[in-house]
Design a protein with these regions (language model features):
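C-terminal catalytic or substrate-handling cores of phosphate/nucleotide-
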Residues: 53, 63, 69-204
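Core mixed alpha/beta domains of very large multi-subunit molecular machines
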Residues: 1-59, 63-76, 191-204
């Protein structure tokens, strides 16, 4: 199963087919052409998918079709962004706002900003993976990506996630580069993550 976007092959579960479970067959529609049942543990590996309408791509595997995957990263097991970074409604100075666990008002992510942030964190994960980042560092970036994915829909405190997971530090370590004017900046740093940008190559 592949859910888009995903942080790496550690978020691609490969299922074992079992068509003999009477309990499971009783749940599925007998008229369905194809149907797959999964449990919450499998959904968790799908970059934090839940059962409220998330979609995945099903790829049948055989001797000619082989999908590479890895075991889930330890730091992602049991992590639920909707619990870790939830917010609540509160009336402050006559206005209804969202506050985090510390009671501090937070700004909720818009749909457009979510797309931008997903691009940023996806590029970061790509650059880190290609640079051979440690599993613990990848866990931080992927945890933040899981928060960003659900931030708009579930009104999560993505700013706190950015701090807790040290995203600025990871950007500096894996994406710091100098442009042709000698100015340093962070952002997509490899050919894969910069594929949609115009890159100037200095003459030698």
């Amino acid at each position: 199963l592949v859910r888009y976007p995903h942080g790496g092959t550690f978020e691609i579960p490969i299922l074992t087919v079992n068509n003999r479970s009477r309990k499971c067959r009783a749940i599925l529609d007998p008229n369905a052409v194809d149907a797959i049942g999964i449990n919450p543990k499998v959904a968790e590996q799908l970059s934090g998918a839940d059962f409220d309408g998330d979609q995945v791509v099903v790829i049948p595997t055989n001797s000619r079709v082989k999908i590479k995957n890895q075991k889930p990263l330890k730091g992602l097991i049991g992590f639920d962004p909707k619990t870790a970074y939830s917010t609540d409604e509160k009336v402050v100075n006559g206005k209804t706002v969202r506050v985090n666990a510390a009671g501090i008002p937070v700004k909720i992510m818009s749909k457009e900003y979510k797309q931008k942030q997903m691009g940023i964190v996806s590029n970061l994960i790509t650059d880190m993976t290609l640079a051979g980042a440690k599993p613990e560092e990848l866990e931080r970036a992927v945890r933040h990506s899981m928060v960003v994915i659900d931030a708009e829909k579930h009104k999560l405190d993505y700013k706190q996630s950015e701090k807790d997971n040290g995203i600025a530090e990871l950007k500096k370590k894996y994406q710091l580069h100098t442009n042709e004017n000698g100015n340093e900046s962070t952002g997509a740093s490899t050919l894969l993550s910069r594929r949609n940008q115009t890159i100037r190559v200095p003459e030698t």
